[in-house]
Amino acid sequence: MKEKVILAYSGGLDTTAIIPWLKETYNYDVVCVCADCGQEEELDGLEQRALSCGAAKLYIEDITDEFCDNYIVPCVQAHAVYENKYLLGTSMARPLIAKRLVEIARKEGAVAICHGATGKGNDQIRFELTIKALAPDIKIIAPWRDSNWKLQSREDEIEYCRQHGIHLPFSTDCSYSRDRNIWHISHEGLELEDPANEPNYKHLLVLGCTPEEAPDEPEYVTMTFEKGVPKSVNGKAMKVSDIIRELNRLGAKHGIGIIDIVENRVVGMKSRGVYETPGGTILYEAHQQLEELVLDRDTTTFKMDVGNKFAQVVYEGKWETPLREALQAFVEKTQEYVTGEVKFRLYKGNIIKAGTTSPYSLYNESIASFKTGDMYDHHDADGFINLFGLSLKVRAMKKLENEKKNNK
């Protein structure tokens, strides 16, 4: 009986060509695994395609809810944003996909796991760090770094498939390189490879429209959260995945969540991409609006640093690490009172606050009001400012003393 390899399979050109290559190069039985993270129509016809290319079996694993509940929600709660823009759509998904690859490898008794990530990108790191953390005994095959892989271009892969009698049921024309799941869709390549070029949004966008093309009338949306977890949209209770789908629909309609970023990859190079994250952008903003109301200042400022570190850890593929677990434990503690309702309106790419309420609100109108109130005496500020500015006063006094000495 042949040994088995588990292939992370998308059905695209790369992983289609990898199936016969694995059989020829390693004499393995190829078990394909497609992880459904909410990419929907991209899964149509996948099983037939994999088997016709020589795969022994195909698993289509629906991990959408696990992705939303256990990966997206912690990142939203941490307000993890990489380099102030990227909402980690691909970064969050890869560790979960790798985890499922390991689980199926154990089930099938496979000796190796293969992925089609290139040697220039971040995904190779995200896949392999997770596999190493969960299954250090399993061999990892990365064709684009394998000396036996002779296919150096898209044209080479197309010709290789033709020679092996593989029909490619999709366009082989040069197009954007895309990654899609329930959270986002990313676009790279073509005119985006030159940062001097403006994106061709009419050709590029898949989920939504530009702000200029959005409706001329705003749309009001209300969300509720319980302990930092989204629970409803416009009065309708839903599980997290359905909330994201509904926010995607609303956000895409109003031109929300389109970013053009030049980011620093883990491997050292810069890359340029356009991301569509309509629902995610709304969810991050709504959650942050509620936190503004219920978190104290010290927690808020420290949490900003934690969020930046959380984003870096996730971006670098370090999900299965003690540091990510520790950061998440802190974040979860901060979410105890992040419960309430957030109202906002969507208008031409903008999310405009329209009111926030919480039973745990730390906003006290009788203190904050410009009107005179019993709970705050303006004279109390005298002593506070004297103490708060004491170090500045001492420094200034010393400076004057030294200047007088020098002028004598």
Curated annotation (Swiss-Prot):
Catalytic activity: L-citrulline + L-aspartate + ATP = 2-(N(omega)-L-arginino)succinate + AMP + diphosphate + H(+)
Record flagged with keyword Amino-acid biosynthesis: yes
Main location: cytoplasm
Entry's Gene Ontology BP terms: argininosuccinate metabolic process; L-arginine biosynthetic process; urea cycle
UniProt-annotated binding residues for L-citrulline: 86, 91, 122, 126, 177, 186, 263, 275
Entry similarity comment: Belongs to the argininosuccinate synthase family. Type 1 subfamily.
NCBIfam families, sorted: argG, PRK00509.1
Keywords associated with the record: Amino-acid biosynthesis, Arginine biosynthesis, ATP-binding, Cytoplasm, Ligase, Nucleotide-binding
First-level EC class: ligase
Organism listed in the record: Lachnospira eligens (strain ATCC 27750 / DSM 3376 / VPI C15-48 / C15-B4)
Pathway where it operates: Amino-acid biosynthesis; L-arginine biosynthesis; L-arginine from L-ornithine and carbamoyl phosphate: step 2/3
Key word Protein biosynthesis present: no
Listed GO CC annotations: cytoplasm
Record-linked PROSITE patterns: ARGININOSUCCIN_SYN_1, ARGININOSUCCIN_SYN_2
Matches recorded under CDD domains: ASS
Protein name, as recorded: Argininosuccinate synthase
MF GO annotations: argininosuccinate synthase activity; ATP binding
